[in-house]
Amino acid sequence: MTVIPNVSIDALKNHVGETVRVNAWLTDKSGKGKLQFLKLRDGSGFVQATVFKGDVPEEVFEAARRLSQEQAVRVTGEVRADERAPGGVELAVRDLVPFAANQAEYPITPKEHGIEFLLDHRHLWLRHRRPWAILRVRDCVERAIVEFFHQEGFIRFDAPFFTPNAAEGTTELFEIDLFGEDKAYLSQTGQLHAEAGALAFGKVYTFGPTFRAEKSKTRRHLLEFWMVEPEVAPATHQDNMDLQERLVSFLVRRVLEECAAELAVLGRDVAKLQPAAEGNYPRVTYTEALDIIRRHIAEGDLPPNVQPDVQPVEWGDDLGAPHETILGFHFDRPVIVERYPAAIKAFYMQPDPADPRLALCDDMIAPEGYGEIIGGSERIHDYTLLKARIEGEGLPLSAFDWYLDLRRFGSVPHAGFGMGLERVIAWITGIDHIREAIPFPRMLTRMVP
């Protein structure tokens, strides 16, 4: 008998009728009498293996019967087609070799567990179907981001994690004592350094972890999350919005192409993602967005997760989560809201020449109530105006002197944006909280594991 070694579970469909060897872990088992059903996983997928007492030596059947949940095992068996099975195949076991026995009872049993218990055991929960599916989608999105920007002619540009200054204000910074002499902060964004990169290379993007000391417990916030931040020079506000739409539609298409099995595990309605894959995202001004929100509130036409007493937004106020949710349900695909009041946006955003009260900025709001996934703007390129804005925010000019150099020498209109990776993954996968979209979430009350 020829045995094909080291076959991954996701490749079993290519070996129907053949005998293969699989290295896996036992997720669950059942059966009685002469038949045992073993549910196996190997990271690439899941498969059911059947052990019939008449087909294997007694010691193999007993070894299968004694297996404990999450014990590692090497299984040799024939691949059989079965339309009812996940992946369309199952494994008829001919031999089975357990690895080391577990040292204690595995804590995440097949019964239902609460989210706090599962997060306490996140290092083990990662092995189960739901996080497996979510994090494989994350991997797909990360790979697609890199591919997209490579195709668009960008270079990856690594920004530092330690920074002497704030880009989005000082209230959300993690402060670090540098040997008792100087203060530094964990970076809120790679944007400022990416601007330097754009003026050197034309098109750059940063991609890495970001840290915000937000004392928020909402389903949209983490203390540590990942952002992709492209910067382009020269570029306009219009160019920036076009790039955002191309990126997001590319990511959704790629997930639909590559992650059908993962989305099925999550029960995601892929029809709701199709419009986002097609592009043609609506664009409305901040003022137009307020009108849409007011109309929905006045008519009582509200999404299920928005309270009926929600108040309209006054002009000059930022959109809250309920207002973004209303906008997200008004459209069947992401909507770009542009030209917010400059007073509620960051100091580096270019004023609208047609109305200086406004900034040439935008937010992309995901549908189905997932809220903002992108924030971007054309950057101020005038030295005098940027210097005045920094001073107006009460920020130390000394910390931004290098940033002002970008306007002293070879300044040009340029633009960029930041996209929150976990928010995008939460929307695409249809999960309720972004804590599941990152392997080990860091929140106000959670630093372990």
From Swiss-Prot:
Catalytic activity: tRNA(Asn) + L-asparagine + ATP = L-asparaginyl-tRNA(Asn) + AMP + diphosphate + H(+)
EC number: 6.1.1.22
Classification via InterPro entries: Aa-tRNA-synt_II (IPR004364), aa-tRNA-synth_II (IPR006195), aa-tRNA-synth_II/BPL/LPL (IPR045864), Asn-tRNA-ligase (IPR004522), Asp/Asn-tRNA-synth_IIb (IPR002312), NA-bd_OB-fold (IPR012340), NA-bd_OB_tRNA (IPR004365)
GO cellular component: cytoplasm
Xref: Pfam families: tRNA-synt_2, tRNA_anti-codon
CDD domains: AsnRS_cyto_like_N (cd04323), AsxRS_core (cd00776)
Keywords: Aminoacyl-tRNA synthetase, ATP-binding, Cytoplasm, Ligase, Nucleotide-binding, Protein biosynthesis
Top class in the EC scheme: ligase
MF terms (GO), sorted A to Z: asparagine-tRNA ligase activity; ATP binding; nucleic acid binding
Compartment(s): Cytoplasm
Swiss-Prot/TrEMBL GO biological process terms: asparaginyl-tRNA aminoacylation
Quaternary structure and partners: Homodimer.
PANTHER family documented for this protein: ASPARAGINE--TRNA LIGASE, MITOCHONDRIAL-RELATED, ASPARTYL/LYSYL-TRNA SYNTHETASE
Family as reported in the entry's similarity comment: Belongs to the class-II aminoacyl-tRNA synthetase family.
NCBIfam families: asnS, PRK03932.1
Protein name: Asparagine--tRNA ligase
Biological source species: Deinococcus geothermalis (strain DSM 11300 / CIP 105573 / AG-3a)
Gene designation: asnS
